[in-house]
From Swiss-Prot:
GO biological process: mRNA processing; sno(s)RNA processing; tRNA 5'-leader removal
This enzyme's EC code(s): 3.1.26.5
Subcellular location: Nucleus
Gene Ontology molecular function, alphabetical: metal ion binding; ribonuclease P activity
Residues the entry annotates as binding Mg(2+) 2: D422, D440
Record protein name field: Proteinaceous RNase P 2
Subunit structure: Monomer; forms dimers in crystallo but monomers in solution.
Source organism of this protein record: Arabidopsis thaliana (Mouse-ear cress)
Compositional bias of kind Basic and acidic residues: 1-16
Biological role: Endonuclease RNase P responsible for the 5' maturation of tRNA precursors. Preferentially binds precursor tRNAs containing short 5' leaders and 3' trailers. Also involved in the maturation of mRNA and small nucleolar RNA (snoRNA).
Broad enzyme group: hydrolase
Length: 528
């Protein structure tokens, strides 16, 4: 054999005798069990998982952990919809949970949710709520979620145990957990079924606050209540006679609801129909409102903007930046008679990303003229534009006269160097409660302020988008009405129904009304 062949042969023998470093290390019994349980969970094989569990608890080699119990409990709770497995899943699930607790292992949120679902499937809402309360009282890193409470709440509502359902809701509220449509509908249904008219009123407003458009299932619950005998017996106890108070409440709430209680007398008229493009109900001819944020929300929004703007400027280590924003606040206080705020940079730079493209003052001028034309009070809007941009425009002889005219007329404010003009135009629009013309989606601001729900509502009411097609301007004004549940000062209700395509012209609305003082030819003198 040649020397080279001998060397290769020896090297091969040595390598084959050495362990392969890339070879998978054998798993310990606990890891093996968890792997197999996860496989059973994916395939929804409850029987196989229980067999693995039974073998593990009789073995001295396996020590069950929280993950093992969690996987088993999840699989049990996921099997309760299968009639053939329901009893097995419930019985073994409770057995597994008892062993978990007796072993000194604290259940996490996922495990508690699974046990609550098992208890609810058994019809034991008390136990479902008990395990959640015990979990919350212990505290820790894992916190309850809507899904943790839902089994107990829905179980109580289904069994018409209204007071217990309300107790669960109170516990959720204390934990900072908001209801969603399924839970609100369940509470609405049990309240209607047990004749609690004040609770029905409360949960209708919960739907308005958290849901917007309702599902067909929820609509049926609402319809059954208003068509029922109890709803017709509920009067307004004189509330409806104080029309001034109701109108003021609607105004303070931002439009679309007053929240003072049932208004009107007698049976309700329930109709399903459509709403015109201008917001006129085609069933009762009532004009739907364009719902804005209320006074408290708006002021909180303005205060948040000021705080965030100041904080950003402080982080820039400039001793002047807080002063200049305060100067703008003072200036706006003196000159703040505007119906619209214009994001100058957004409009001037629109579609200018081409060779030789620059700031288009003509586009900005078109927007200004159109807003002035559409203003019923012949008012010019206010442009917010960075001082550097204003300086450049003033240096251009073609633009100088127009820009100087805007400045002298108080319709152009130059934001100072080192400042983000976004904060200026957003603050101005919020403070003055007026329109904001920009195509900016403002995604950077949403999560820093009051949350996406509030900010989305504010944008829907105040943001004006625009397009230029072949140089022709088109402004996209906010909708003349809001597609949300509405309660009028007359006591009528309008419920928009969820639809797949969200096409407003074909959306079904349920219109609910009855006789009120505003329908009477004479009043008691309280109507202003």
């Amino acid at each position: 054999m040649a020397a080279s062949d001998q060397h290769r042969s020896r090297r091969h023998d040595e390598s084959s005798s050495r362990p392969n470093k890339k070879k998978k290390v054998s798993r310990n019994p606990e890891t093996n069990l968890l792997f197999n349980l996860n496989s059973c969970s994916k395939s929804k094989d409850l029987s196989a998982a229980l067999a693995l569990y039974d073998a593990a608890i009789t073995s001295s080699e396996v020590r069950l952990s929280q993950q093992h119990f969690q996987t088993l409990l999840y699989l049990c709770s996921a099997s309760i919809t299968d009639i053939s497995l329901q009893y097995l899943a419930i019985d073994r699930g409770f057995e597994i949970f008892d062993r978990m607790v007796s072993s000194g292992i604290s259940p996490n949120e996922a495990s508690v949710t699974s046990v609550a679902r098992l208890a609810a499937a058994k019809g034991n809402g008390d136990y479902a709520f008990k395990v959640v309360k015990e979990f919350v009282s212990v505290g820790g890193v894992s916190i309850p979620r809507l899904r943790t409470y839902a089994p107990a709440l829905l179980c109580f509502c289904e069994k018409l145990e209204a007071e217990k359902g309300y107790e669960v809701e109170e516990h959720m509220e204390a934990a900072g957990i908001a209801l969603e449509e399924a839970e609100i509908s369940a509470l609405l249904k049990v309240s209607a079924a047990t004749g609690r008219e004040n609770k029905v009123y409360r949960y209708l407003h919960k739907l308005r606050e958290y849901v917007g458009c309702v599902s067909e299932e929820t609509l049926k619950i609402i319809e059954e209540w208003f068509c029922g005998e109890k709803a017709g017996e509920v009067g307004d106890n004189g509330i409806g006679s104080d029309v001034g108070m109701l109108r003021e409440a609607v105004l303070n709430n931002g439009g679309g609801w007053h929240g003072h209680g049932w208004v009107g007398e007698g049976k309700w008229t329930v109709k399903k129909g459509n709403v015109s493009s201008t917001g006129r109900c085609l069933s009762c001819s009532e004009q739907l409102a364009c719902v804005d944020t209320n006074e408290v929300e708006t002021q909180k929004f303005v205060d948040s903007l000021v705080a965030l703007a100041m904080d950003r400027k402080t982080k820039m280590n400039s001793c002047e930046t807080n002063v200049v924003f305060s100067e703008f606040q003072d200036w706006l206080e003196k000159h703040g008679d505007y119906e619209a705020i214009v994001d100058g940079a957004n409009i001037g730079l629109y579609q200018q990303n081409f060779v030789d493209g620059s700031f288009s003052l003509s586009q900005l001028e078109s927007v200004m003229k159109e807003l002035y034309r559409e203003s019923g009070n012949n008012k010019w809007p206010l442009i917010l534009l960075h001082k550097r941009r204003v300086k450049t425009l003033l240096e251009n002889p073609t633009h100088r006269n127009l820009v100087e005219e805007w400045i002298s007329n108080g319709v152009l404010y130059a934001t100072p160097p080192g400042s983000n003009d976004d904060w200026y135009w957003l603050y101005a629009a919020a403070k003055l409660k007026c329109l904001l013309v920009t195509n900016d989606e403002m995604r950077d601001h949403i999560f820093e302020l009051l949350g996406s729900t509030f900010f989305q509502k504010w944008k829907e009411r105040h943001q004006v988008r625009y397009t230029f097609v072949k140089g022709n301007l088109k402004l996209e004004m906010p909708s003349p009405f809001s597609v949300v549940i509405q309660e009028s000062e007359k006591g009528s209700w309008h419920f928009p129904v969820s639809c797949e395509n969200n096409e407003e012209s074909s959306r079904t609305w349920m219109c609910i009304s009855r006789q009120s003082i505003l329908d009477s030819p004479k009043s008691n003198g309280k109507i202003p």
